[in-house]
Structure formats: C-alpha cells, structure tokens
Amino acid sequence: MKSEQLKIPQATAKRLPLYYRFIESLHAAGKQRVSSTELSQAVKVDSATIRRDFSYFGALGKKGYGYNVQYLLSFFRETLDQDERTNVILVGVGNLGTALLQYNFSKNNNTVITHAFDVDEKKIGTKVGEVPVYNWDKLEEIGLQNVSIAVLTVPASQAQKSADRLVKAGIEGILNFTPVRLSVPAHIRVHHIDLAVELQALVYFLKHYPL
C-alpha cells in the first residue's frame, strides 16, 4: 500500500482487500456500477462503514449513482499494489503449513509463497503445492532477496526463536499462526491469527450475543 495512504485507520486498511476481491468479481461478471448497499450485502460490512472507508480516499462515487466498478477496480488495484508481486516465505511445513502451501494465496494474484522451510529431513528437498521445502538451518545461506514477509506455522515452542531468526534475516512482517504473542523490535509488524482464540470468541458471542 502506498506510503501516503498509511494514515488511514488500520481497521479500514484491513477491509480494503475484502472490497477489492468483491469488486474484482463484479468486474468479471460485467457489472458496471455498484451501490454501497450492494457492497454491504456482499462483504457483510454495513453500508455506513463502507462509505466512511471510501471517504478517506476522496470522492470515489456519486450520490444517487453509486460507484463505477471499473474505476474502483483500478483505484484499489493501485492502492493495494496489485501490479507488484510480493514474495513470501513459510516456516513450518506441518498440517497447517502444508494446507497454506497448497492454497498458496490462489485468490491473490500478487502474493506468492516462494520458499518453505522445515527441520524434518523427510520434507526437506520435496515440494508442496509446487513450493520447494528447504532446510531451516540453511536460511541464511539461501538468502531472502526480495522477501520481506514470512508466514509462521511452527510449534509454539519454536515460535519466538523462529521469529528472532527471521528478523535477523531481514524479514519485516510476520503472519503468525502460532498461539505465542511474539516479542519483536518496534519496526517489525506482526499479525496474529490464533484459530483457537477465534473459535472461543465465536462460542462466546453465540451464547451471549445471539442475532
């Protein structure tokens, strides 16, 4: 995302890829315009929030007309750097890591897992979903040219050590699937995805906030 647009709220920034994916599908279907209400129904974000999110970028639509799909597609493609390929590595080729490698961000044309790392000799030298698996001990030798993001799917006991090593190797962003809250330098961005916590939260909301 362009540096001048980083001042938008983080919650808004997280929704932009969701908007882009739906707008992309509208364009593929030949639709020429869309309203905030239609967007709301599709992405499950209320229309007022969508209008507020869009307002951070100026006049993207017209009152009474809605939004031009082609214009939105071009705008978000540029905003989300869709024409620039982002190389990603994955550390930990267990069950979850394997699933992510086989998926390999198939809906994100500009994001590709190029390398995977593990300590299991049976996995090293193989390919999972066309992604080669390398020896974790050879990380520094292989090098991470043009790679700034890592997906972390190692056992919890290895999470912090792995993160420390990734930071030293030049990684700037970590998508952390482990339950460990990583301690990293201030300039490193970490997004935590704890499936157990999300499931517990869902159970709680179902019990205490019925729809």
Swiss-Prot record:
Subunit structure: Homodimer.
Pfam assignment, any one: CoA_binding
Ranges in coiled-coil conformation: none
SUPFAM superfamilies found in the cross-reference section: NAD(P)-binding Rossmann-fold domains, Winged helix' DNA-binding domain
Function: Modulates transcription in response to changes in cellular NADH/NAD(+) redox state.
Molecular functions per Gene Ontology: DNA binding; DNA-binding transcription factor activity
GO cellular component, one term: cytoplasm
Keywords: Cytoplasm, DNA-binding, NAD, Repressor, Transcription, Transcription regulation
Gene3D superfamilies documented for this protein: NAD(P)-binding Rossmann-like Domain, Winged helix-like DNA-binding domain superfamily/Winged helix DNA-binding domain
Protein name (database record): Redox-sensing transcriptional repressor Rex
Classification via SMART domains: CoA_binding
Protein family (similarity comment): Belongs to the transcriptional regulatory Rex family.
Ligand binding (NAD(+)): 92-97
NCBIfam families: PRK05472.1-3, PRK05472.1-5, PRK05472.2-3, PRK05472.2-4, PRK05472.2-5
InterPro entries registered for this protein in UniProt: CoA-bd, NAD(P)-bd_dom_sf, Rex_DNA-bd_C_dom, Tscrpt_rep_Rex, WH-like_DNA-bd_sf, WH_DNA-bd_sf
GO biological process, one term: response to redox state
Subcellular location: Cytoplasm
DNA bind region: 18-57
